[in-house]
Amino acid sequence: MFIQTLARQSTSSMYAFSSPDDVIQEVNSLIHHIFFEQVNAVSKTNLSIEAIKYHLLSPGQQFRAKVCLDACMKLDVAYNDMLILAAAAELLHEASLIHDDVQDGDEIRRNQPAVWKKFGKNIAICAG
């Protein structure tokens, strides 16, 4: 519902921000809203959701989201659409990292136990 509302409001390609970091903050806010507010309202006891939240609380460099934002700006994509696309790119990459850790047996991700190490391989696979 939130994303549909955001997409409907997306009529302008005017970028009202002072730096790319401002937009990354908005992308992070969108991801936070999805997983920490919207999903919480639906499922408070799902271990896979808890594993996703755990992973997202230690963000990386967000390179893929930044590349997506850059491409969207070059293509004059509407601002809200740009946020949705960058959030999707970042979430897809984060999911791949969870699976990568399971596959490689890496126990640490971003200076904390990898999702599979904390929640188990089955939960990590579902979370990713």
Question: What is the role of each PLM region?
Answer:
Residues F2-V39:
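N-terminal amphipathic/basic leader segments beginning at the initiator methionine
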Residues V39-G128:
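Mg2+-dependent prenyl diphosphate-binding active-site environment of isoprenoid biosynthetic enzymes
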